[in-house]
Amino acid sequence: MLLVGSGAKFVQQLEQCGALAIFVTPEGGSEGHYLRRLRGAGYEVVTLSSKGIGDLASYLTSSHGVRPATLGKSQRRTYFYPSLIEQYRATLPPKAKGLVFWFYEGHVLSRQELSYLVKLSQEDKGVKFVVELGRERSIRWQPLQSA
């Protein structure tokens, strides 16, 4: 599939809105073009699956507990991890513009979680979000608050 355009409008609209909903083609592959454009623009991109995250607010902004699977008679343990935003912000290169969290399978997120991502991107200007909300014949995006 030939991609028309350089992806500059995508990066520009993400910088303007802070959070975008993206609809990609069913065969996939075209979103890699936009991932490369974001990296080329100076952003550190983190791709995550939306399935199995749990509480999105605690996962992104506060320390959260993770319980590994118990195999047999092993003890039940809970490991606590720092917030994902702080974890990746600590490893950012000095010249990076910020973080972009790219959520695929975003159709499983509720409206409340999507509005939280919009609010978080407005509060913290160094963090942006791209959420894949569905499939279309050609790739398109729109601000997440209007999706």
UniProtKB/Swiss-Prot annotation:
E.C. no: 7.1.1.-
UniProt main location, coarse: membrane
Membrane topology: Peripheral membrane protein
Pfam families in alphabetical order: NdhN
Keywords: Membrane, NAD, NADP, Plastoquinone, Quinone, Thylakoid, Translocase, Transport
Reaction equations catalysed: a plastoquinone + NADH + (n+1) H(+)(in) = a plastoquinol + NAD(+) + n H(+)(out); a plastoquinone + NADPH + (n+1) H(+)(in) = a plastoquinol + NADP(+) + n H(+)(out)
GO (cellular component) term, any one: plasma membrane-derived thylakoid membrane
A GO term, aspect molecular function: quinone binding
Compartment list: Cellular thylakoid membrane
Protein purpose: NDH-1 shuttles electrons from an unknown electron donor, via FMN and iron-sulfur (Fe-S) centers, to quinones in the respiratory and/or the photosynthetic chain. The immediate electron acceptor for the enzyme in this species is believed to be plastoquinone. Couples the redox reaction to proton translocation, and thus conserves the redox energy in a proton gradient. Cyanobacterial NDH-1 also plays a role in inorganic carbon-concentration.
Family per record: Belongs to the complex I NdhN subunit family.
Assembly description: NDH-1 can be composed of about 15 different subunits; different subcomplexes with different compositions have been identified which probably have different functions.
HAMAP family: NDH1_NDH1N (MF_01353)
Full protein name: NAD(P)H-quinone oxidoreductase subunit N
Organism: Synechococcus sp. (strain JA-3-3Ab) (Cyanobacteria bacterium Yellowstone A-Prime)
Gene that produces this protein: ndhN
